Amino acid sequence: FLKKLGMPASEAGNRYYYAHSTPYLDMLLGVRYLIQKTGFMPEVETVEKVAVSDTVTSYRNRYALPVGFLVNSETADFSVDTNENAFEVQNDLFAKMTGIKEPLYTAVDVKDVGHNGVEVSRNGYGYYTYFPMSTAAEPYLKYNFMPEQDTLLYAYLSVDKVEEVDIYQNERYTFSQKLAKQPYIFPLGSYKAGEKATLKWNVDRKSIQNGAITLFVYALNQDVLEQGYQQLAAGGLQVTDWSDTRLTGTLNADHDGICYLSIPAEDGWHVTIDGKQTETISIGGAMLGVPVSSGTHTIALRYCPKGTVVGTICCGSAILLLTFCFVIEQKQKRACRSNSVGRRRKTCEP
């Protein structure tokens, strides 16, 4: 789920990470605050600075949503396997949740390139293969993008044996983005219409192998984001009580739908709506959801790990059995001691 939505994740290693990505992903994960170690935030429009300490800066997410919020019933049909492009997967989920037809992200195609010492073939939008030429002293790849309107740009880059990519705005260096082994969506910053965004990275000139590149650059449609945020926030779950294993809140649903929860779906969650037990669903095979009807409802969640009751009964039974065996053993020992003392007394009598 996280990997297909553009977050760094390794299914083989069972490793899942958070990296600053898009405001919509932060909505889905319930992120309210961000801490930036370098103090640099490429897109300040989506966050608000709240504190600074040396080089560390904390930000408040302007598009934060509560732990639960009302989404359309079509969200239950969402599948992460419909597309390999993380932006289009987000577009699909956003449309199902909100019913808004306009896409949240729009693809920005390559304006031109400035490669050096590398032969590159394009295999479709975002997909390339390259072959470094041994004669080049410092081979590198360079892609330029130019949005047609003021926007926030985001990129998804997957390339082997590259640790970071340099980002330029109108030929001016802005920052370097570290690339993890697990690729993910990252922000490029805010751009005016006609401004040039450049991604440039060096290629290992010792390599004689073909390399594969996946590079998507998309523009965020901020009006669509704002419309969707206002809609989802209006159906937010108002939390009234919570603990490590319990959560209670009130949801005002203006239509039949699903209460999406930024909580991983597990069998251990038990949910009641207005005091009645209800079945949960898994959204995208990962997140918890609860079908609700229109109206005002009290939703209560309680977590008890699957197998806890059976495990407790087995453990209790084992303790009782051990206690019973211990008591029997002690009685037998006392009986043996009594018999031994009696025999010694008879032996000692005149």
Features from the language model and the residues they span:
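Hydrophobic beta-strand segments of well-ordered beta-sheets in folded domains
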Residues: 32-33, 84-87, 98, 102-103, ...
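Solvent-exposed, low-complexity, intrinsically disordered
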Residues: 340-350
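Aromatic/acidic, Gly/Pro-rich catalytic loop(s) in extracytoplasmic/lumenal soluble domains
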Residues: 24, 29-85
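Extracytoplasmic/lumenal acceptor-recognition loop(s) of multi-pass membrane glycoenzymes
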Residues: 1-25, 65, 70-75, 81-90, ...
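Predominantly extracellular/luminal regions of secreted and cell-surface proteins
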Residues: 87-116
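Active-site-proximal, structured, solvent-exposed surfaces of multi-pass membrane proteins
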Residues: 112-342
